[in-house]
């Protein structure tokens, strides 16, 4: 072997080693920057290491929108469920055009990992996830498991500054009608005509008709009770009360299977206005992979409708107040 040949081989080996080293460093850097694990949830620890990741956009969707101003996850954009996720004139979800403009202002693209969180164990964050999914972004959306509750439990940072991300260009799809139940769907299920299981996720007292709505609620119905044939699995049974995190997949399967909900039939979930039921929708649809529609009209529509069948176990009668 000549000296020149040996030199060429040595140089080639060096280039290969350097290339492999660079690739290893790049892989390590990506791992540190963080691509979240596949699935519908992210952990607080992962998010805390990815707050500066340009491919991650965080949104707060809380029952109390004022929480955001008092302190939020650094870089998070506030979504007010009263105005940003609904039509403010007619009772409906936000239009595709308005939602598209809102997300472009927040810098969301087709490559963005969207992390949603909120108070009350992610009630309205899950509602947000449902709306995102309706407009074709479901695969990009993840809930921060445990929401604000677990983030604060870990004493992770909060900020009061409002971010100003670069405006993006985004085209939404949908709406995906297979994710949303209408009154006609619920009536067909109540009559046993569409082979669908209905799950009422309200409290036992609301389900039985003892209560028209939780104390302090402004959106009321003038009839109490539940959709005939509905299964009652209170939404909060799906979470760990100490952390606010979802129970394990096996625990969730057992919870719903014990109530006769095993994913073998299509499912409709409802509550009072659709926000608590979106949490159950997330558990059943995104975590367990069942075929589920959220009935966002829920009891404020059903319990105010004329002539619909109702099961009122408590016999409570509306007294006009």
Residue ranges and their predicted role:
Residues 1-9:
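N-terminal secretory signal peptides that target proteins for export/translocation
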Residues 36-65, 69, 75-78:
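Mature N-terminal segment immediately following signal peptide/propeptide cleavage
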Residues 32-41, 49, 84-85, 148-227, ...:
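Active-site neighborhoods of enzymes that stabilize oxyanions during catalysis
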Residues 13-28:
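Bacterial N-terminal signal peptides
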Residues 63-66, 82-86, 120-123, 148-150, ...:
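Solvent-exposed loop/turn segments at secondary-structure junctions
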Residues 85-113, 234-266:
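Helix-loop module immediately N-terminal to the HCX5R catalytic loop
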Residues 94-193, 210-211, 225, 276-293, ...:
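Thiolate-centered catalytic microenvironments shared by cysteine-dependent enzyme domains
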Residues 254, 259-315:
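C-terminal soluble interaction/assembly domains
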């Amino acid at each position: 072997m000549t000296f020149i040949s040996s030199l060429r081989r040595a140089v080639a080996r060096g280039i290969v080693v350097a290339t492999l080293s660079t690739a290893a460093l790049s892989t390590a850097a990506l791992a540190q920057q963080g691509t979240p694990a596949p699935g519908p949830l992210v952990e607080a620890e992962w998010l805390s290491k990815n707050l500066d990741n340009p491919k991650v956009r965080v949104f707060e969707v809380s029952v109390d929108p004022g929480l955001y101003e008092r302190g939020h996850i650094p870089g998070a954009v506030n979504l007010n469920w009263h105005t940003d996720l609904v039509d403010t004139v007619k009772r409906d979800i936000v239009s595709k055009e308005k939602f598209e403009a809102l997300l472009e202002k927040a810098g969301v693209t087709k490559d963005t990992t969207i992390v949603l969180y909120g108070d009350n164990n992610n009630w309205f964050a899950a509602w947000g996830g449902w709306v995102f999914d309706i407009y074709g972004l479901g695969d990009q959306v993840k809930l921060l498991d445990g929401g604000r509750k677990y983030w604060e439990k870990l004493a992770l940072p909060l900020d009061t500054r409002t971010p100003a991300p670069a405006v993006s260009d985004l085209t939404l799809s949908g709406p995906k009608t297979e994710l949303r139940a209408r009154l006609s769907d619920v009536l067909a299920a109540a009559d046993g005509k569409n082979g669908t299981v209905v799950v009422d996720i309200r409290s036992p007292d609301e389900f039985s008709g003892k209560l028209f709505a939780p104390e302090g609620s402004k959106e009321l119905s003038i009839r109490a009770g539940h959709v005939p044939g509905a299964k009652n699995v209170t939404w909060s049974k799906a979470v760990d009360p100490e952390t606010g995190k979802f129970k394990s997949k096996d625990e969730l399967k057992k919870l719903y299977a014990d109530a006769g909900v095993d994913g073998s039939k299509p499912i409709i979930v409802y509550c009072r206005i659709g926000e608590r039921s979106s949490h159950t929708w997330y558990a059943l649809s995104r975590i367990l992979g069942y075929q589920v529609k959220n009935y966002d009209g829920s009891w404020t529509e059903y319990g105010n409708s004329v002539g619909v069948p109702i099961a009122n176990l408590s016999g409570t009668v509306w007294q006009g107040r």
